[in-house]
Amino acid sequence: MKFVLLFGVFLVTLFSYSSAEMLDDFGQADEDELLSLIEKEEARAKECTPRFYDCSHDRHSCCRSELFKDVCTCFYPEGGDNEVCTCQQPKHLKYMEKAADKAKKFGGKIKKWFG
């Protein structure tokens, strides 16, 4: 019985030591990965295409508005044969942003009344 108890304590100690080392390794890897993702996001944010500008070179480069990312929309101008692509905000997303803004303002008023 003493042998089983001693062996159990040894296994628990070994397991806790190995899991602590693994967590330290994962924590360091997560921090490094997070920093690299932030750097990539900052670099990508500088290269976005503003609304109503040409996005034919990269159709996924449109900038974000407050809540949603603009969409690269392509069309043929009247009487033209060349396709034109610009970053635009779809109407349904525009209305959703307006509704969210009004809800935010209304929430601020309620908070003022009861806060």
UniProtKB/Swiss-Prot annotation:
InterPro entries recorded: Spider_toxin_CSTX_knottin, Spider_toxin_CSTX_Knottin_CS
Mind listing the GO molecular function terms for this protein?
toxin activity
Q: In which tissues is this gene expressed?
A: Expressed by the venom gland.
Q: Where is the signal peptide?
A: 1-20
Superkingdom, taxonomy of origin = Eukaryota
Give the UniProt keywords, A-Z.
Disulfide bond, Knottin, Secreted, Signal, Toxin
Q: This protein is called what?
A: U3-lycotoxin-Ls1a
Domain commentary: The presence of a 'disulfide through disulfide knot' structurally defines this protein as a knottin.
From the record, give the cysteines joined by S-S bonds: 48-63, 55-72, 62-87, 74-85
Localization, per the record, is:
Secreted
The UniProt family comment states: Belongs to the neurotoxin 19 (CSTX) family. 01 subfamily.
- Heme recorded as keyword: no
Gene Ontology CC annotations of this record: extracellular region
Propeptide residue span(s): 21-44
Q: List the Pfam families.
A: Toxin_35
Q: Does the keyword rRNA-binding apply?
A: no
Q: What is the lineage of its organism?
A: Eukaryota, Metazoa, Ecdysozoa, Arthropoda, Chelicerata
Organism per entry: Lycosa singoriensis
